[in-house]
Swiss-Prot record:
PTM comment, free text: Isoform 1 is heavily phosphorylated; isoform 6 is not.
Effect the entry attributes to changing S228A: Impairs phosphorylation by AURKC
Lineage, highest ranks first: Eukaryota, Metazoa, Chordata, Craniata, Vertebrata
Biased segments, Basic residues type: 226-242
Modification type N-acetylalanine: residues: A2
UniProt entry tagged with the keyword Transcription regulation: no
PTM-bearing positions, type Phosphoserine: S4, S10, S44, S147, S153, S228, S248, S276, S381, S406, S483, S591
GO biological process, one term: nuclear migration
Species of origin: Homo sapiens (Human)
The encoding gene: TACC1
Coiled coil: 610-805
Role this protein plays: Involved in transcription regulation induced by nuclear receptors, including in T3 thyroid hormone and all-trans retinoic acid pathways. Might promote the nuclear localization of the receptors. Likely involved in the processes that promote cell division prior to the formation of differentiated tissues.
Positions with biased composition (Polar residues): 47-60, 111-128, 296-305, 377-413, 431-447
Record's protein name: Transforming acidic coiled-coil-containing protein 1
Amino acid sequence: MAFSPWQILSPVQWAKWTWSAVRGGAAGEDEAGGPEGDPEEEDSQAETKSLSFSSDSEGNFETPEAETPIRSPFKESCDPSLGLAGPGAKSQESQEADEQLVAEVVEKCSSKTCSKPSENEVPQQAIDSHSVKNFREEPEHDFSKISIVRPFSIETKDSTDISAVLGTKAAHGCVTAVSGKALPSSPPDALQDEAMTEGSMGVTLEASAEADLKAGNSCPELVPSRRSKLRKPKPVPLRKKAIGGEFSDTNAAVEGTPLPKASYHFSPEELDENTSPLLGDARFQKSPPDLKETPGTLSSDTNDSGVELGEESRSSPLKLEFDFTEDTGNIEARKALPRKLGRKLGSTLTPKIQKDGISKSAGLEQPTDPVARDGPLSQTSSKPDPSQWESPSFNPFGSHSVLQNSPPLSSEGSYHFDPDNFDESMDPFKPTTTLTSSDFCSPTGNHVNEILESPKKAKSRLITSGCKVKKHETQSLALDACSRDEGAVISQISDISNRDGHATDEEKLASTSCGQKSAGAEVKGEPEEDLEYFECSNVPVSTINHAFSSSEAGIEKETCQKMEEDGSTVLGLLESSAEKAPVSVSCGGESPLDGICLSESDKTAVLTLIREEIITKEIEANEWKKKYEETRQEVLEMRKIVAEYEKTIAQMIEDEQRTSMTSQKSFQQLTMEKEQALADLNSVERSLSDLFRRYENLKGVLEGFKKNEEALKKCAQDYLARVKQEEQRYQALKIHAEEKLDKANEEIAQVRTKAKAESAALHAGLRKEQMKVESLERALQQKNQEIEELTKICDELIAKLGKTD
């Protein structure tokens, strides 16, 4: 299979360089692709309109692009290695088998480093059309219910489970999110996982694909765009297969089928830290650290016990999580769809991040080559580890995995490009295979595609405005885990060493924040320490913003947020599948740059540059933090001042209102008094008029009284004269009366004397009569007594006589 220079790009670079082309050329691609893609394209367009793709710099940064720091081409030459978190020990036989597979895959990759651009892939169109037809024959796929960023995500619970999830949903181009909780890496178990998953890759892939198909989960197709220079990708046919029954077919298809030319399925709206545009629809895969070096670099996070982790990852049931509803971060991002479609926006970043997250998980595991141990770690954690800086395969600025060898893909594999479902860490150039073939592309191809960037650097985005700086525990990263893949990484630096470009605000801040974390870890020398990360609510963060970390914080936050929202986990998916079928199987898709080797001096130089860049970025991050704190203090002070000002203004307004109310009341009262006074005045006037009339009347009456008085005076004089005459007559009559009275009195005295004499005589006669009566009464009483006595004597005599008789 041939890779064009455009295919060997980091996710953000590819998106920045091809977004305008992809949006512009989709109309022409629709005609070539046939009528099959119309419904899915319309759905994708709707999703594109709903997703936000504006640059973070537009609203949050004012730094022009020309002033942003220039990224060194060596920054992305190595990818950070972070072992899968998982206890247990890998047997020596598994290690030897891995080393043999490393050698074989490196030999396979050596012959395919040179390639032509994918524009000439004519046979691939037929394959894509056939894939689209087969893909549309699946009725249960509901494009509207697919989560744009992580339609299929797997997580582990209790921060002790390995996030072991299949890395690619190659059969239908869906982006697989690995959002296990970050765990301390346990390389022995991780190596065992890889050895086991080599034999059972097809089984695991088919299990995840079958679960996806049952859940109606499929990837939306490419949105018809306006300025696309790239052919419209079409999804590969999806086939439901039983895990056990199709295992042998899967191995056969993976091993024997050459990698066909296929179109990439690129969806800028699914551009996510978890997905590389070079990997197609596969999420980044995480390779375990070196067995020898990981014990020293294991996180001191003792809460995540290794033994329990291994047991849970093997014994817990397989749980596939399908996100049929878009999370709030994506919804809010879609509401804020920008009008500048020429610039790609990082995927929406949900604010929640796992605290002990090392790795998003092995669910996006690389093709389980032995190179996988040395291979790429998925960019699912933003936590750099100073112990990984010595690793030749440590790429703090790479957006996905270390260089790995990839076995050929199945003939049915095709690229899928869907701007609606594009994830920043998704590689649209990474071919995806059907479920029968291995769902993993070459780790080496992934790393090559990652580090070979276009002349202009991709722009990572990290919005710092409205962000809170939180403490985040970092895991010790085994930088020497990739030491066994020395010949596959740094030789590619020569291809990108002469390329240069301006980093955007997001890229600068990404490397700043990440460099701060890495440098802090290096200086302190602690396997685990609290590092600050920017937690932005609903802020898009591109893949490169924590690119130097083997597991990017943006991806981890986003994936973990989705996983926590969906609430379903898959524990030890690769381990369980590897236990069932620990047969080594070649992974699909060969790397375009096979067998590229790097010398120790090149590795040392690259690591030195990376360290210097990390220190510089950490210093810059500290400066930004100081500026942020100063600005925050100023803002707080200004808020206080504004609050006081508002209080004062409010008090003044209230006083003014009170004064106005009082004045208004006084005015109303005075108005009422005035009206009352006017009424009183009117009544007084009426009274005065009445009084005047009465006065006039009384004047007439008074004149009449004067006339009457004169008449009465005359009468009085007459009466006085008459009184005098009558008085004289009275005196004469009085004298005459007195004389008469004297005579009468004398006569009365005489009569009284006669009467007294007569009464005395009468009294004497009466006395006599009374004496007579009294004497008669006494005699009567005596007679009565005598009669009684006689009666008694008679009665006694009669009684005596009666007794004698």
